[in-house]
Amino acid sequence: MRDPVSSQYSSFLFWRMPIPELDLSELEGLGLSDTATYKVKDSSVGKMIGQATAADQEKNPEGDGLLEYSTFNFWRAPIASIHSFELDLL
């Protein structure tokens, strides 16, 4: 009798939906055809995959348009701006 715990059908990898492949033509339609700023493999330790190097950022001074909508920047509360006249009121 087969052990149900070690069965291939109880595996997470068996039941999860496969990740769809990216269509590069869709990325070009979104204006993201320049894939040079996205690194597939990075040898330096402590650096996130997909993070542009300093040399790449100098080549592209306007920056990546999607960095504004990263999960950290999108979900955090905005930094309050306090002007000098407001500080005088405190």
From Swiss-Prot:
Q: Which disease is it linked to?
A: A chromosomal aberration involving MLLT11 is found in acute leukemias. Translocation t(1;11)(q21;q23) with KMT2A/MLL1.
Question: Which keywords belong to this entry?
Answer: Chromosomal rearrangement, Cytoplasm, Cytoskeleton, Nucleus, Phosphoprotein, Proto-oncogene, Ubl conjugation
Modifications after synthesis and translation: Ubiquitinated, leading to degradation.
Q: Does the keyword Acyltransferase apply?
A: no
This protein is called Protein AF1q
Please give the function described in this protein's UniProt entry.
Answer: Cofactor for the transcription factor TCF7. Involved in regulation of lymphoid development by driving multipotent hematopoietic progenitor cells towards a T cell fate.
Q: Might you report a single GO cellular component term?
A: centrosome
Predominant location: nucleus
Q: Which organism is it from?
A: Homo sapiens
Report which residue ranges the record marks as coiled coil. none
Q: Tell me which residues bear Phosphoserine.
A: 84
- Known tissue expression: Expressed in myoepithelial cells of normal breast tissue (at protein level). Highly expressed in thymus. Expressed in colon, small intestine, prostate and ovary. Not detected in peripheral blood lymphocytes and spleen.
Q: Which Pfam families match?
A: WRNPLPNID
Q: Where is this motif: Nuclear export signal?
A: 24-32
Q: What is the similarity comment for this entry?
A: Belongs to the MLLT11 family.
**Which subcellular locations apply to this protein?**
Nucleus; Cytoplasm; Cytoplasm, Cytoskeleton, Microtubule organizing center, Centrosome
- One example of a Gene Ontology biological process annotation: positive regulation of mitochondrial depolarization
Extract the InterPro entries matched here: MLLT11_fam, WRNPLPNID
Quaternary context: Interacts with HSPA8 and LAMP2 isoform A; the interaction may target MLLT11 for degradation via chaperone-mediated autophagy. Interacts with TCF7.
